[in-house]
């Protein structure tokens, strides 16, 4: 998915699921409507390994909706990273992981630096400002 607004809406819960997902033609499995491609899989196994989950899947349907891939710049992945860091703020704060929490805020600010220095896209700049603003509210 090359649409940051999808990630923003999911993380900040600012939209309904209406229009965000669509069903495939072959299986009643939803996928993100704006995805360039998607793979539908059958879950073969799911296990916890060292505090992480390991899923083994078998592809059952591959759909390519856009034949020409979109190009990326550093801003897009930096915003996605910032969203991931943002989702860790509450758990780190709750668990009183002070050192990790401080590092998390530093990483968020680094993501902001990357976005500001790699794009002039107004939408991307607004997204990173929103993430930082919300993060600082959580810190307070």
Regions found by a protein language model. Give the residues of each.
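Basic, polyanion-binding surface patches
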Residues: 1-38, 42-140
């Amino acid at each position: 998915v090359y649409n940051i607004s999808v990630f923003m809406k999911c993380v900040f819960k600012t939209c309904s699921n209406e229009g965000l997902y669509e069903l495939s033609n072959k299986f009643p499995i939803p996928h993100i409507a704006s995805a360039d491609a998607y793979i539908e899989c059958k879950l073969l196994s799911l296990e916890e390994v060292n505090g992480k989950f390991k899923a083994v899947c078998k592809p059952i349907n591959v759909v390519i909706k856009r034949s020409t891939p979109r190009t990326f710049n550093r801003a897009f992945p930096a915003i996605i990273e910032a969203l991931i860091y943002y989702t860790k703020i509450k758990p780190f704060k709750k668990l009183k992981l002070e050192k990790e929490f401080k590092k998390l805020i530093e990483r968020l600010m680094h993501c902001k630096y990357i976005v500001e220095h790699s794009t002039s896209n107004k939408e991307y700049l607004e997204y990173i400002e929103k993430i930082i603003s919300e993060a600082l509210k959580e810190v307070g």
